[in-house]
Structures are given as C-alpha cells and as structure tokens.
Design a protein with these regions (language model features):
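The feature captures the beta-strand-to-loop junction immediately N-terminal to the Walker
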Residues: 45-47
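Helix-to-loop junction immediately C-terminal to a conserved catalytic motif
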Residues: 60
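Conserved ABC ATPase "signature" region
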Residues: 121-140
Length: 166
C-alpha cells in the first residue's frame, strides 16, 4: 500500500515507477513503485523469490528493467549506467558481503572515495578518517577485508556506502 502519491516527485529524491522485470516468460518483478526521500533508508521485506533483490538491482543499474522508469531528483536515470548512478549517490547495501576481501579496510573505502572528483585528496583523507572513526574501525585500517568478523565487515560496508554522501 502506498502512503504517498507516486506522482509527487518534488518531495522525493528517488522514485521507481511501474518497474517490471521479465526473464523469458517468467515475470519476476511486476509493477513495483518505490519512493524514497532524501536521507531515508529503506529495505524491502518479502518471501524468497519475491523480486526484492532484482528491484534493487534495477534501481542501481545492475540490470535494466523490462518496463518502468527510475527518477533521481526529477531526472530520469533509467538508462544511466551503474557508475553514473553511483556518482549521483544511488547505492545499495547487499545482504551478502560486498567488501573486497583482499583489500585493506582503508583501500575498500579509498576505492569509492577516489571517484569523488568534488573532493580534494586532503578532503578524501579527512572523509576516510571520519568514517573509520564513526564506525569504530580505525584500528582495522590495515586489515584485509577477508580477515574481518561479520560485524566488522558490515560496519566497513556501511562506511563505504556513505563515502558518496548519499
């Protein structure tokens, strides 16, 4: 059930309208609408095979919808590649581990921060230090992702997702 009008894009940062995804004759996502306000965090709940991950993949640009559109700040981004959406702040924190196990914690974050052309190298370093402190992983800065506990890995994933200031 929708709690707000999907056509009211002015108050929303991200809107997905009428998303469909079909693989052959199998419909895996059927007419999904999502509206996310700036600074809002959302999750989708549902049974296995309901299309939750596929919906997030369409929003982030990992896969193209069969039908439907995605808007970010009133601009249609449906056909934008994933890297352009990421630069605009569209991100997804997957339920499966997504940090690079052979990279250090520091380099996992730097990988994203280096895409921030709006930040100087010094500002990138300050952002890195701040996020490591905020998530209590400064002491793990030089540790490889594959050596982290589940909770540490999750905190690094969240810190990395915030590198783009979504």
């Amino acid at each position: 059930k929708q709690s707000r009008k999907m056509s009211d894009q002015k108050n929303n940062s991200l809107i997905a309208k009428g998303l469909h995804k079909k693989y052959g004759s199998r419909m895996v996502v059927n007419n999904v609408d999502i509206s996310v306000n700036r600074n809002e965090v959302v999750g989708l709940l549902g049974p296995n095979g309901a299309g939750k991950t596929t919906t997030f993949y369409m929003i982030t640009g990992m896969i193209k919808p069969t039908k439907g559109d995605i808007f970010l700040d009133d601009k249609k981004i449906t056909l934008d590649p994933m890297y352009k959406r990421a630069r605009k702040g569209v991100g997804y924190l997957a339920q499966e581990p997504s940090i690079f196990s052979k990279l250090t914690v520091e380099n996992n974050l730097k990988l994203v921060l280096e895409m921030r052309k709006d930040l100087s190298i010094q500002e990138q370093e300050e952002k890195l230090d701040g996020l490591l402190d905020d998530f209590s992983v400064s002491s793990l800065r030089g540790s490889k992702g594959g050596n982290l506990s589940g909770g540490e890995r999750r905190r690094v994933e969240i810190a990395r997702s915030l590198c783009m200031d979504p």
